[in-house]
């Protein structure tokens, strides 16, 4: 957060808006408490530095998964307890409002098995699209992509310079293992590491060196946080792994093994943070679904427009398409 407080490599005057996505989980709730406390301390100084504007986006948990509680009462609590931040709550299906042309992208991604009826409400359209994906891993992967695109598009709509993510060391380790397994290894330089993302926004992970147990100890000191946080349910051993996505499997693995070997999980995230973006030729093409650059391993020149399909999908998104996953 020093980067934003001291305006390193950022405009020296005017507002410096940043976005914090809040899931009501332990990590993002603790991060909000910490960052808001920093804003409060800056404002108490006789001549405070410009600092930054804190915007918080909550994507309704129940719109991501029906098994998640709606937690509606928490939104009012947040506004009362963190007055120096602005809060917005959106359902996941509002991604249609923020990402232009998404209906055509989803229709081509799924293929003829899915027909997008634009006359239906956005929620029903998204439900129909998600129902057309039968693989647990593919469904979780696409949900994650749509969630990221909504958050990034919302940040851009506010003119934010960066996004601060509330991922703990455990979460980043699980995300690293899952993304490599899904073919999204090239995205680790911005999905897990601090720095500039392919979307022109600075991504920061201030909690990258803290374990979940440490964050829980912090939250226990502040009762107001306990009224906001949705606790994670206990991991059940009596469950079929074939019904779990790769993301869920890796999170379960890190949660169980991280308690025994915390140093190993720390090494995973620290090593990934040293990676640099690929210098492979991209031709400037972006994946239609996840909006990241598509690498051109053969170093070919850009194809003529008439030779290109309507939309391009990266390797990972191609793998998760129905019929291939």
UniProtKB/Swiss-Prot annotation:
Family, similarity comment: Belongs to the CTU2/NCS2 family.
Localization in the cell: Cytoplasm
Pathway field: tRNA modification; 5-methoxycarbonylmethyl-2-thiouridine-tRNA biosynthesis
Keywords in alphabetical order: Cytoplasm, tRNA processing
GO terms for cellular component: cytosol
Name under which the protein is recorded: Cytoplasmic tRNA 2-thiolation protein 2
Single annotated GO MF: nucleotidyltransferase activity
Top-level taxon of origin: Eukaryota
């Amino acid at each position: 957060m020093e980067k934003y407080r001291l305006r390193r490599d950022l405009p020296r005057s005017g507002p410096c808006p940043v976005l914090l996505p809040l899931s009501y989980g332990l990590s993002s709730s603790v991060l909000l408490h910490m960052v808001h406390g920093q804003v409060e301390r800056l404002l108490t100084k006789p001549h405070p530095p410009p600092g930054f504007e804190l915007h918080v986006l909550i994507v309704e948990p129940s719109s991501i998964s029906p098994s998640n509680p709606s937690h509606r009462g928490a939104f009012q609590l947040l506004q009362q307890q963190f007055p120096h931040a602005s809060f917005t709550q959106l359902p996941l299906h509002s991604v249609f409002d923020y990402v232009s042309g998404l209906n055509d992208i989803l229709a081509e991604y799924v293929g003829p098995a899915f027909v997008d009826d634009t006359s239906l409400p956005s929620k029903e359209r998204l439900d129909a699209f998600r129902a057309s994906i039968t693989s647990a891993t593919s469904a979780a992967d696409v949900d994650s992509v749509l969630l990221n695109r909504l958050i990034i598009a919302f940040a851009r709509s506010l003119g934010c310079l960066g996004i601060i993510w509330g991922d703990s060391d455990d979460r980043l380790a699980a995300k690293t293992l899952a993304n490599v397994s899904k073919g999204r290894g090239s995205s680790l330089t911005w999905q897990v590491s601090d720095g500039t993302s392919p979307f022109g926004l600075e991504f920061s992970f201030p909690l990258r060196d803290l374990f979940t147990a440490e964050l829980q100890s912090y939250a226990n000191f502040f009762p107001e946080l306990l009224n906001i946080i949705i606790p994670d349910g206990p991991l059940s051993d009596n469950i079929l792994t074939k019904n779990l996505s790769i993301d869920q499997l890796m999170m379960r693995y890190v949660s169980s093994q991280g308690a025994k070997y915390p140093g190993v999980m720390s090494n995973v995230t620290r090593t990934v943070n040293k990676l640099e973006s690929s210098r492979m030729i991209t031709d400037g093409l972006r994946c239609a679904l996840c909006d990241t650059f598509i690498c051109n391993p053969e170093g070919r020149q850009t194809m003529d427009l008439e030779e290109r399909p309507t939309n391009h999908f990266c390797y990972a998104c191609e793998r998760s398409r129905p019929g291939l996953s």
